[in-house]
Amino acid sequence: PKDIVQPYYFVQYDNHSTGYRGLRTARYTFVVHATNGKIDETVLYDRSNDPYQIHNIARRSPKQVGQFYKQLKTWLNQTNDSFTNYLTIQ
């Protein structure tokens, strides 16, 4: 999405293969979590319809998730974050 407000690092653990990375736009919050180098959770919240971020819409929004994955991977590459090695385009 072109309307990224700011990319956020939510948590980064010491081994760099476990943790969270995400992006936030004016409307959406997107987060991925990896454990030992494997993505085990992807979260997408539409804050305009779900301001408390309760309902994860990632599974029913594969096109948006794919766009966010690409944007996040680009950002991680630009910042030399090794977490990019664990992202595969969904």
Model-found features: residue ranges?
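NUDIX/MutT-family hydrolases
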Residues: 46-47
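Short, charged, surface-exposed hinge/linker loops at domain edges
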Residues: 84-90
